[in-house]
Regions:
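Sec-dependent signal peptide recognition
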Residues: 1-3
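N-terminal signal peptide c-region/cleavage motif recognized by signal peptidases
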Residues: 8-10
């Protein structure tokens, strides 16, 4: 149930506007729904392409996009003078939300962001039932799109909150626009550049590799003060995990703590010499790739068979979550600790219910990606819209201001010097020998 513009590939940047997401009730009719919202049947059908099919039948539980009437422009469409954070006034319990992302079906970026956007829509529908209303404005920003026409749209400056962009070169003009008009800008995915360090209106969700390495090293030093670290050189010239292993070794040396280094090609005897017989050994690989993990597990099996009393734990990488169906038994066996910024639990009732609703709304399953893009959009929209609705311009996304329990992606922001807010939420997933998973939040 996406607007037709999502599939249009010939236009660089487009905007879609609607006043509601309506769930069809038992005795509803197309005419009755259109009449209720003071729009024409044609406008309703244009916003919901499935309704234009010859065999279409209105069904209970179906979700319909309700557009604004073309004959009666909504207030958000009226040109307004530039506003600042100090002067911006927001209608009570209504948040104007902008989405500036590639929303198309041309490539993987567009498909992933479309799913993310669908999650935002589902969050807005959920919030409406709790008395928090939203007006959503979405712009389809291709990779090479000029953002100027989008920022010139009168609807853009009326937003309280904008999600996007995806591409680095679009960040600065959009961020400058948001600072000028007192708008919160949420950058949801990976970008290069340090705009968050200078622009106090940016919320940067993505954590750089260097920042993630620092958080991981902090967690390791906090949890394994009395352990014996064992670094395994996996001979992977393509690995970028040296950012973490170098940082951790510096921390250990500064604290006067010893560690061992071994090699994946070492003989079983030489490999065993790197391990302590009296302390817990924490194994750290310098790659996140599956083949090297597999080889390491095989060597640990030989070690454990030879020395059954040796205590072993693994300290891994976020990529390991992608391999869990293959290695999960080993994660439990060797007490794996996996750093992550999200926790996807398909068996959690709330997650399963949302995935079921997604299937009903959009006639497809979520992409098999980690993290799930729709859940990411849902969590981020819930977090920010709730926060802005409660705290207004004072919302900073700190742990003290959090009003939402996430399904997958926790958020906790901290200000970057005199700049914006950086997400510093960090989780260790601890796979325990009793086959339970402990979630350790920092």
């Amino acid at each position: 149930l996406l607007c037709a513009w999502l599939l249009a590939s010939s236009v660089v940047a487009q905007t879609a506007k609607w006043q509601d997401l309506y769930k069809v009730k038992k005795k509803d009719t197309i005419y009755g729904i259109a009449h209720k919202y003071n729009i024409t049947i044609e406008e309703l059908m244009q916003a919901n392409p499935d309704m234009q099919k010859p065999d279409y039948v209105l069904k209970k539980g179906e979700q319909l996009l309700i557009p604004f009437s073309k004959q009666t422009p909504n207030a958000a469409q009226k040109p307004t003078a530039p506003t600042s954070t100090a002067t911006r006034q927001r209608v009570a319990n209504t948040v104007n939300v902008g989405v500036m992302l590639p929303l198309h079906n041309v490539d993987g970026d567009g498909q992933r962001m479309t799913e993310y956007y669908r999650g935002v829509l589902m969050a807005c529908d959920s919030l409406r039932s709790q008395g928090i209303n939203t007006n959503i404005f979405a712009w389809n920003l291709y990779k090479d799109a000029d953002v100027s026409p989008v920022l010139a749209d009168a609807n853009a400056k009326n937003c309280n909150l904008i999600f996007g962009p995806l591409y680095t070169k679009q960040v600065k003009p959009i961020a400058d626009f948001c600072r000028k008009h007192g708008i919160r800008l949420v950058i949801p995915f990976s970008i290069n550049g340090g705009d968050v360090e200078t622009n106090d209106h940016i919320f940067q969700v993505y954590q750089s590799k260097v920042f993630t390495a620092e958080l991981s090293a902090n967690a390791f030093m906090n949890r394994f003060k009395d352990a014996h670290p064992v670094f395994v050189d996996c001979n992977d010239s393509t690995s970028d995990k040296g950012i973490f292993t170098s940082e951790l070794r510096k921390r250990l040396e500064a604290a006067g703590l010893s560690y061992s280094i071994t090699n994946l090609k070492s003989s079983p005897e030489m490999f065993a010499k790197a391990f302590s017989a009296v302390k817990q050994n924490v194994v750290i690989l310098n790659t996140g790739r599956s083949p090297q993990l597999n080889s390491t597990l095989a060597k640990l099996n030989v070690l454990r068979a030879t020395f059954p009393n040796v205590r072993i734990a693994l300290f891994g990488y976020n990529e390991w979550l992608m391999y869990k169906r293959v290695y999960q038994d080993y994660y439990y066996k060797y007490e794996a600790y996996i750093p992550t910024a999200y926790v996807y639990n398909e068996y959690a009732p709330a997650t399963a219910n949302l995935e079921r609703s997604y299937r009903q709304w959009f006639k497809s399953d979520m992409r098999q990606a980690l993290p799930r893009f729709a859940l990411t959009g849902y969590d981020q929209a819930q977090f920010f819209i709730r926060g802005i609705n409660k705290y207004g311009v004072k919302f900073e996304g700190t742990q003290q201001q959090n009003t939402y329990t996430p399904l997958q992606t926790p958020l906790k922001f901290k200000r970057v010097s005199n700049g914006g807010m950086q997400n510093n939420s960090f989780i260790l997933l601890h796979y325990k020998p009793n086959r339970t998973i402990e979630t350790i939040s920092y």
